[in-house]
Amino acid sequence: LKVLVLAVHPQMDTSVVNKAWVEELSKHDNITVRELYKEYPDEAIDVAKEQQLCEQYDRIVFQFPLYWYSSPPLLKKWQDLVLTYGWAFGSEGKALHGKELMLAVSTGSEAEKYQAGGGNHYSISELLKPFQATSNLIGMTYLPPYVFYGVKYANAEDIAISAKRLADYIQKPFS
């Protein structure tokens, strides 16, 4: 199983969880980690390069901290530019058909806030629905996300454990 992780954090150097995840995932031969803000500091995305990379992998993982109930802006821009009509969707757009899409998400708040009646009023599953809809449109299989809740309450041990669990999770077969 070849896995491409697109790590999207605008301040990766000062990140706690996402940085630890990148460091752990980079140790695995079948996982390629690309930090999009580092790759494109000017946000000028090389669409052809990104499409070619996506075609080489079985599973694509979007890794990001939840920002305002969504992803950081560069991931949205990446989707807008890379997942084009005729390549990712439409009658001729089948480049990603049969591949898998997974999310690896960190949140500042604890899990209890992400449910009906919780502080955020919606479950993480509801908040991530646009990614599932995108996956459906482009013919990918949407896999259950890996979520690390409560970053602001986590200690170093929690973070190290989460990184190892993520590495195991994104490599496991789901079908």
Where are these regions (language model features)?
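N-terminal beta1-alpha1 ligand-phosphate binding loop
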Residues: L1-Y37, L166-A167
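Hydrophobic/aromatic beta-strand patches that form the interior of the parallel beta-sheet core
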Residues: L4-L6, T32-R34, V61, M102-A104, ...
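Flexible, glycine-rich phosphate/dinucleotide-binding loops
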Residues: M12-D13, Y40-D42, E110, A154
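Generic recognition of short, well-ordered alpha-helical segments
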Residues: V16-A20, I45, P73-K77, E157
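Glycine-rich phosphate/pyrophosphate-binding loop and the adjoining helix
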Residues: V22-S26, L128-S175
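N-terminal beta-loop-helix "entrance" segment that forms/cooperates
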Residues: I31-C54
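Helix-loop-strand module that forms the ligand-binding subsite of alpha/beta enzymes
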Residues: A48-Q132
